[in-house]
């Protein structure tokens, strides 16, 4: 792979190659997968797995960050003929935090058409789904979720699938369409992010994970943030949120979007606050609306909107141990108290939905009153906001806008299930997207672990997407190594949840690795793992020679105490001494 402009490279995983599965419904839909080859003589077929890394791990692709990735969905939009190009708003100095001259990140120079829905047209995936239309995006995600499983009759509708929460043996585009029409799943993909490979978020599909990146007023740069994005998707992040709060927000986001094959989410309130020099009281609806349109035209796929934090709910937090811990929530609470009025996000929610509908932006309804400590878990403030999010969901659905619901937070294990049950009931089964939750507050530096415990549980109970937590949570801005640790930790949690849910094909990789382990196929063990580099490095710390990867033991047990080696001996002895006949009664 050729590198230009930025020193960023993600080579393919060892013994892996990028393959593409062609749709039988759409000639211009090719879905990427990763194929893991196993040792010759193992009698194991190559294993196909879900792949989020985009073109960055395709050895036949030349990456030029100054040009961005291929616009794979423009042909689909063109065929539907329900969008139009127009002149976008001009970039203003305040869009980049009033950054000028040498302090300004250079603008992304490659121009592209800015699209919006034609007047009166509903161009969201939910609108198509409700109209009974199967889109290329729906077909794409069905193929992805099947992880290479061939479907002989793609057009066969699953007429018995209704809104009953069942997981099918085989995903079809019709099943995907039905889930989106019900509001139980979303495909977050702005029409202005044609580089994005469609993916689906819903509890009847693979549990997805999100990785947060973003610069701050203190640290980080455009190159670092693109590097983090590419690194996060290499290790398995399904979406990325750009939570930048410093200068150059607009330009950094443009570079990220043009080079991202996964959906990008934002919290528009952060940029709006930068436009008023960080003074929450000076925020206005007009400034926020302008920010929404700015980001919509760039191609942001989903917005976190803290419209559920209402003025009457703020006093409910007075006796909390940690008060309001959401950045967006605290900003809006401060604004509401200063102006003694209802949140402008709540008051103008219909208009927010109109903007989202125009570009097919999904709304992630933010939990501004999530608990920031286990002492505050499941309190009145949290569930009052959750009920409001359910009311807002119906407003969005009435306009065919896709919605997911954000959730906590800090929740001890015995209170996690109630969160899922309340969300399904109050929010009408819209996808749940949770931060962890963290199950204890005593482990700064290890909160990727405290939260992964809760994440695995709530994913099992029905959460559709998990927002990763890194070791730096509560302590500082994550670096590249923290991003990798957070992503892999959450891939483990999500996969554990998929196994518990009984997701089709979820256990195939586990079984393949277990067989490799029992057969002492060390290279296959490494290559089937989530992090082959670390697995191999740990093995090689004590047994570094290539010949050591052929022996039937590791340094943990040695040759005499290896239980699996002894199991092989037992099986061999049993085969040799097996009596003739059925072994019952005497032979005549």
Curated annotation (Swiss-Prot):
Pathway: Cofactor biosynthesis; thiamine diphosphate biosynthesis
GO cellular component: cytosol
Catalytic reaction list: 5-amino-1-(5-phospho-beta-D-ribosyl)imidazole + S-adenosyl-L-methionine = 4-amino-2-methyl-5-(phosphooxymethyl)pyrimidine + CO + 5'-deoxyadenosine + formate + L-methionine + 3 H(+)
Binding-site list for Zn(2+): 410, 474
Coiled coil location: none
Cofactor list: [4Fe-4S] cluster
Enzyme Commission identifier(s): 4.1.99.17
Pfam families: ThiC-associated (PF13667), ThiC_Rad_SAM (PF01964)
InterPro entries: ThiC (IPR037509), ThiC-associated_dom (IPR025747), ThiC/Bza_core_dom (IPR038521), ThiC/BzaA/B (IPR002817)
Keyword 4Fe-4S in annotation: yes
Signal peptide per UniProt: none
Cofactor note: Binds 1 [4Fe-4S] cluster per subunit. The cluster is coordinated with 3 cysteines and an exchangeable S-adenosyl-L-methionine.
Biological processes annotated in GO: thiamine biosynthetic process; thiamine diphosphate biosynthetic process
Alphabetical keyword list: 4Fe-4S, Iron, Iron-sulfur, Lyase, Metal-binding, S-adenosyl-L-methionine, Thiamine biosynthesis, Zinc
GO MF, one annotated term: carbon-carbon lyase activity
Residues reported to bind [4Fe-4S] cluster: 554, 557, 562
Homology family: Belongs to the ThiC family.
Function: Catalyzes the synthesis of the hydroxymethylpyrimidine phosphate (HMP-P) moiety of thiamine from aminoimidazole ribotide (AIR) in a radical S-adenosyl-L-methionine (SAM)-dependent reaction.
Record's subunit section: Homodimer.
UniProt protein name: Phosphomethylpyrimidine synthase
UniProt source species: Bartonella quintana (strain Toulouse)
Taxonomic placement: Bacteria, Pseudomonadati, Pseudomonadota, Alphaproteobacteria, Hyphomicrobiales
